[in-house]
Amino acid sequence: GGLTLQGLDDNAAGLGVMLELAERLKNIPTKYSIRFVATSGEEEGKLGAENLLKRMSAEEKKNTLLVINLDNLIVGDKLYFNSGQSTPSSVRKLTRDRALALARTHGVYAATNPGGNPQYPKGTGCCNDGEVFDKAGIPVLYVEATNWALGKKDGYQQRSKSKAFPDGTSWHDVRLDNQQHIDKALPQRIEHRSRDVVKVMLPLVKELAKAGKA
C-alpha cells in the first residue's frame, strides 16, 4: 500500500497507545528507567529492532529487564498477553500473568495463547519485533489482538473470515487497515480497545518500574 496504507491496526494504534503511556508516565518518578521506542522495517525483516539490538552494548542488554511489544491491537477478536519463549517463568508471572490479572480487575477481556500449535507453546507469542529480543535472551511481553484458536493456530488469523475481513485479517491491506473501514465494520472498536490496553498497561508499567507519586 505504500503511502496510501494507513496501517491503523498495524501499527498506528500500537504507536498511539505507546505515546499515551509516555504522556501519562512522563512526570512520575520510577526506580527503573522506561524507554519508549518505535522501530521501523518490521515487515522487511524486523530491521529496526535488529538495528536497535545491534547498537546496544553488552551492559545495555544486561540492564534491559523487559521489552514490551505493542502490535496489532484493534482488529483481532481478543486481546492477548504472551511471553517470549526464552522469558524465565519468574518474569512471566510478573508480566504476562500480572497483565491478565489486571485485565480481570479492570473488566478487560484478555487471554493468552492456548498452545494449540506446538511451535508456539502455551502462553508464548512470536513473529514480530519482540522475537528479536527474545532470541537475544531478553525477557519479552507481547501485547496483541488476534485469535490464536483460528487458522494454523499461530496467531496470524485475527478473526473469523467475513465480508468485512475476507481472509480474517486486515494487515498490509490498504482497503481494510484504515480508520473508515474499521469504524464501519467494528464500530467504536478503535477507541474501546485502545482504552482497554492502556487500562492494563499503565498500572502494569508503574508496578514493574516501581513508580512513585507524581
Feature-to-residue mapping (PLM):
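His/Asp/Glu-rich mid-to-C-terminal helical/loop segments that flank catalytic regions of hydrolases
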Residues: L150-A214
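Second-shell loop/turn segments in exported
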Residues: G2-N11, R24, A38-T39, L79-S90, ...
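Hydrophobic/aromatic-lined pockets within catalytic cores
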Residues: K26, S57, A209
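Metal-dependent peptidase/peptidase-like ectodomains
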Residues: P29, T39-Y142, N147-W148
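Short acidic/His/Gly/Ser-rich catalytic and metal-binding motifs that mark active-site loops
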Residues: G1, V75-L79, K153, W171
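Alpha-helical metal-binding/catalytic segments enriched in His/Glu/Asp
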Residues: G1-K46, M201
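Solvent-exposed, polar/charged alpha-helical surfaces in well-ordered, non-transmembrane soluble domains
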Residues: L15-E23, E50, K54, D97, ...
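Short coil-to-beta-strand
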Residues: G1, T64, I68, F165-S170
